[in-house]
Amino acid sequence: MSLAVRVIPCLDVDAGRVVKGVNFENLRDAGDPVELARRYNAAGADEITFLDVTASTSDRATTYDVVTRTAEEVFIPLTVGGGVRTVEDVDRLLRTGADKVSVNTAAVARPELITEITRRFGSQVLVLSLDARRTEDPGCASGYEVTTHGGRRGTGIDAVAWCREASERGVGEILLNSIDADGTREGFDLEMIRDVRAVTRVPLIASGGAGEPEHFPPAVAAGADAVLAASLFHFGPDDMLARVKDALRQAGHTVR
């Protein structure tokens, strides 16, 4: 595990605006992505993740102009994902200003994409973004299923097994998002974090369910190297980032 726990605001972007819903549905406007990125950068965020949440479902490319403007305002690592399908997409995003690129749907459809990207750019630029949900499907031994297209399509693929395979293919980080917990603000899915941590040494970013600063330390204790949230930061008090870091610090974790 890394020495310092990273705290990462997530900007889910639809048509140039930050949105947030519950369980990936009923999206509501949360503001301008460039302004929010600027605010979080000033407030002490360690990184920012930018996800074009409709790119994979509507078959359109990531909004490059928004990425460019965001990168100009942010002086911390910026991860960008949504609609990334090819090595060329990764190259363009890195040239646009992204420090890291996340893949989701396209990697599930063609796992070789992970290998191709890491061979060209290195593992450090690639984040596997995984939207997982609980399932009773006997084909998913862990009890978690990989979903694609913004959580709208089930795959029948075991989420923990997929994390193991992606790690073996060279992915640099795994962004582990619980669809069941997403937007509920009731806490992270600790069992899922523990199960994935048991099969990989790749850094894990816990996502989905944060509702108060006290939810973050248990995620780190379960095995997360970084913690990510959206609605808590978008709709919470201006000092929420500081509160989260204080909670982590008080629980004995190192933060920047």
From Swiss-Prot:
Species: Micrococcus luteus (strain ATCC 4698 / DSM 20030 / JCM 1464 / CCM 169 / CCUG 5858 / IAM 1056 / NBRC 3333 / NCIMB 9278 / NCTC 2665 / VKM Ac-2230) (Micrococcus lysodeikticus)
Subcellular location: Cytoplasm
GO cellular component entries: cytoplasm
Catalyzed reactions: 5-[(5-phospho-1-deoxy-D-ribulos-1-ylimino)methylamino]-1-(5-phospho-beta-D-ribosyl)imidazole-4-carboxamide + L-glutamine = D-erythro-1-(imidazol-4-yl)glycerol 3-phosphate + 5-amino-1-(5-phospho-beta-D-ribosyl)imidazole-4-carboxamide + L-glutamate + H(+)
Pfam families associated with the record: His_biosynth
Top EC class of this enzyme: lyase
Summary of subunit composition and partner proteins: Heterodimer of HisH and HisF.
Record's protein name: Imidazole glycerol phosphate synthase subunit HisF
Family under the similarity heading: Belongs to the HisA/HisF family.
